């Protein structure tokens, strides 16, 4: 196993522990808590994949961080912060909409890269909107936190979420996954539109009907794909 992989996991575990202590003091805002929950799942998946104990890794990560801080000057810290581009966190969904449990009568699931696509194929003839919480850098989608499909009545009928064991995805991965979800929902004569925020930063465009550019042939192909997979 590569030593950098192990040490990276150890540092991530310790930094998550610090953030959790911060949240326990009720100091974290909604985006902070969203990332904390997501990263907890990711660390569990990575720990299982690597065969490493999280508690032991956290202690080792603390030693690494303490050693770095001992060598770090205030001036070097200022320069590092200034050179890193800042990302923004955008929210279509409330914390309640993100954390709400939902159930599927006819569940379908597809894994596309590091993203998991889930939808209820029992839903028919509904108007559906896709909402997402994600981070943006350089006016482009950076990281998807969670995307969910809602009916006009507020019911959740679909979802795209990062796989905890496979961190990392691009805006193209997200667009492809959205295409799969749209194709699957439209297969049952649902009308699907995407939030303006997601259109703007994923596709850098905004259509009046709320639909991102997706060729009809690609839509039909994606619909058949998700229908054939469980």
UniProtKB/Swiss-Prot annotation:
Signal peptide: none annotated. It is found in: Host nucleus; Host cytoplasm. One of its GO terms (molecular function) is RNA binding. GO terms for cellular component: host cell cytoplasm; host cell nucleus. Upon interferon induction, ISGylated via host HERC5; this results in the impairment of NS1 interaction with RNA targets due to its inability to form homodimers and to interact with host EIF2AK2/PKR. A motif (Nuclear export signal) lies at residues 137-146. It holds the Pfam family Flu_NS1. Residues 1-73 are annotated as: RNA-binding and homodimerization. A motif (Nuclear localization signal) lies at residues 34-38. Residues 180-215 are annotated as: CPSF4-binding. The dsRNA-binding region is required for suppression of RNA silencing. Belongs to the influenza A viruses NS1 family. This is Non-structural protein 1. It comes from Influenza A virus (strain A/Seal/Massachusetts/133/1982 H4N5). The lineage of its organism: Viruses, Riboviria, Orthornavirae, Negarnaviricota, Polyploviricotina. The gene is NS.
């Amino acid at each position: 196993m590569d030593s950098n992989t192990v040490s990276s996991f150890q540092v991530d575990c310790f930094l998550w522990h610090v953030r959790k202590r911060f949240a326990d003091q009720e100091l974290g805002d909604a985006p902070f808590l969203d990332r904390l929950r997501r990263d907890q799942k990711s660390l569990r998946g990575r720990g299982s994949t690597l065969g490493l104990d999280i508690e032991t890794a956290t202690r080792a990560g603390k030693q690494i961080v303490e050693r770095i801080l001992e060598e770090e000057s205030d001036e070097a810290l200022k320069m590092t912060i200034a050179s890193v581009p800042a990302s923004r966190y955008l929210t279509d969904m409330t914390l309640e909409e993100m954390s709400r449990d939902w159930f599927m009568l006819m569940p379908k699931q597809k894994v596309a890269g590091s993203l998991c696509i889930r939808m209820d194929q029992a839903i028919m003839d509904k108007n559906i909107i896709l909402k997402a919480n994600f981070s943006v850098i350089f006016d482009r989608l950076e990281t998807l936190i969670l995307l969910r499909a809602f009916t006009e009545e507020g019911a959740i009928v679909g979802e795209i979420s990062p796989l905890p064991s496979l961190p990392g995805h691009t805006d193209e991965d997200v667009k492809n996954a959205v295409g799969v979800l749209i194709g699957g929902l439209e297969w049952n004569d649902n009308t699907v539109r995407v939030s303006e925020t997601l259109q703007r930063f994923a596709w850098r465009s905004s259509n009046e009907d709320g639909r991102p550019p997706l060729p009809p042939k690609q839509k039909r192909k994606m619909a058949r794909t998700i229908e054939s997979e469980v």
